[in-house]
Amino acid sequence: MLDHKDLEAEIHPLKNEERKSQENLGNPSKNEDNVKSAPPQSRLSRCRAAAFFLSLFLCLFVVFVVSFVIPCPDRPASQRMWRIDYSAAVIYDFLAVDDINGDRIQDVLFLYKNTNSSNNFSRSCVDEGFSSPCTFAAAVSGANGSTLWERPVAQDVALVECAVPQPRGSEAPSACILVGRPSSFIAVNLFTGETLWNHSSSFSGNASILSPLLQVPDVDGDGAPDLLVLTQEREEVSGHLYSGSTGHQIGLRGSLGVDGESGFLLHVTRTGAHYILFPCASSLCGCSVKGLYEKVTGSGGPFKSDPHWESMLNATTRRMLSHSSGAVRYLMHVPGNAGADVLLVGSEAFVLLDGQELTPRWTPKAAHVLRKPIFGRYKPDTLAVAVENGTGTDRQILFLDLGTGAVLCSLALPSLPGGPLSASLPTADHRSAFFFWGLHELGSTSETETGEARHSLYMFHPTLPRVLLELANVSTHIVAFDAVLFEPSRHAAYILLTGPADSEAPGLVSVIKHKVRDLVPSSRVVRLGEGGPDSDQAIRDRFSRLRYQSEA
C-alpha cells in the first residue's frame, strides 16, 4: 500500500511540485550544482538562432541587390507588325531565320534582285564586280525589321543554303552558301554578311543546277561538312564535291549515270552507308556516295556501301523498284524507330518506305498530290503529315497518322493555283497549329472565275477540328511564306515575301511580318459543317490562349 506521502502526492500533484521548487530555492548550492552539471543546450540554441537570422539577412540582401541594384538586361521590344518595301525589284523564293544579332529573337534572311541596295547601305552591284541589276542578300531584325546587313552576292542565284557549319576556330560559326549564275560559288558569314570565300564554279555553261545543295560528311578533314552540288546536262546528272571550309573542289566531276530531277535526298541506311535518292520519272533512283567519291577522286574514301541497297539498285539504270503511282514529286525524311524512313510523294499517291528495306509501311490512296506535305502533331506527341489532295475548288487537306497511315481528319479547303506552301508550329499542348492558304470565300468559285486572286490565310488546331480561323487575306502575288516562332512560347508570327510573278518584270517587293496572336481578335471564324456550341468569340479566345514551343 501507498504510504501517506505518496498518496498525498498522487492526489495533489501541483502541491508536490510547489514543495519541490521551494526546496530548491531553499538550497541554492544544490541548484548551482545542477546548473553547472546541465549541458549547454541554451547556448547552442542561441547560436543556432543567430546563424539562422544571419543567413536569412544575407539571403534578403542578395535578393535586394539582384532585384533593385543590378540592372536587368534590356529585352528588345518586338513590334507586332513590320514591313519593308523595295521598288523596282524581284524577290527570290528563299526564306531563312536565325538569331543573327544575338538578341534572342529570330531574324530573317532573304534574297532580292535590284539595281541598288536599300538606303542604309551603299554597296552597289558595280562595287562587287556585277552588272546592274544583281542579287542582294539581306538580313533584317525579327524584332523591328531594321537591316542588320545587306550586300550584293551574285549576278543571279541558282541555289542557296544557310546555317552551314564552319570549322571550329574560324571567324564564322555558320555560313550561307550561294551558287550563282553564271559561274560563282560564294560563302558569306551568316552574322555579318562578309565573304568567307569566293571561287568560280566548275559547272558547264549549259548545265542546269539541281536543288537542293547537299551536305555530306567531312572528307578532307577540315572539321566542316563538305558540299555536293548536282547538275544536269544532256539528260545526265553529275556531282561536284567541294570543301565546306574553303570552297575548293575535291576531285573532278562525277557522273551519276542517270537522268534525274530536283528534289534530292541524302539518306543514311541503318548500316551507316550514305546514298543519294532522287526522283526520275515514276521511279526512285539512287547512287552510293562511296561510288561517287571514288569517281571524282579516283581513290577510296571514308564512305561505305550497303550490300542490300546495291542489290536493289539496277547496275545500269540505277533505278529502284517503283513505289509511286505517277511521277515522283517529293522525297522527305520521317523519323523512325531505328533511323529515318522515306516518304515518297507521287502525283497520284504517296507511300511511306522503310528506311532500310525500302518496303512500304503503308500506302493510302490520294487522287492528286501536287504540293509538298508538312509535318506536325495532330494528337499529343504523335507525328502526323498534312497532305493537300487535289487542287482548286476540289482541294482537301488530309491529316494522316505517320505510324499507321490512318486518316485522322479531312478538311475541304478550296485554293487558288500557285498558292503558297503550308506551315505548322508546335504548341504547348504537344500538338501543332497548322496554317493553310485558300480562297477568301470557301463556298464560292467567283474568285477563280473572275480572276480576282485573293489568298486567305487560315489557322487550324486539332482541338477544334470543325473550325478554321481566317487570319488575313492578301491580293498581291506571294512568293514565299513561313510561320516562325520568333521567341520561345512568346512570339509566333508569319513572314510573307511578295513581289512580281514575272522575274523579268521588276516591281514592288515587300517583306512582311505579322504576329499571329494580334490577328486573332479581328479574325473570321469559319465553321466546317455543323459547328459546336461555342460562340465565335469563345473560339477566338481559345486560339488567343494558345502557347507555342520550340521543336524538341
Curated annotation (Swiss-Prot):
Positions of region (Disordered): 1-40
Topological relation to the membrane, as annotated: Single-pass type II membrane protein
Biased composition range(s): Basic and acidic residues: 1-22
UniProt similarity note: Belongs to the FAM234 family.
Extracellular topological segments: 71-552
Gene Ontology CC: one annotated term: cell surface
Domain of life: Eukaryota
Ranges of the Cytoplasmic topological domain: 1-49
Keywords in alphabetical order: Glycoprotein, Membrane, Phosphoprotein, Signal-anchor, Transmembrane, Transmembrane helix
TM ranges: 50-70
Full protein name: Protein FAM234A
Annotated glycosylation sites: N116, N314, N389, N473
Predominant cellular place of this UniProt entry's protein: membrane
Pfam families referenced in this protein's UniProt entry, alphabetically: Beta-prop_FAM234A_B
Subcellular location: Membrane
InterPro entries: FAM234 (IPR045232), FAM234A_B_beta-prop (IPR055409), Quinoprotein_ADH-like_sf (IPR011047)
Residues bearing PTM Phosphoserine: S21
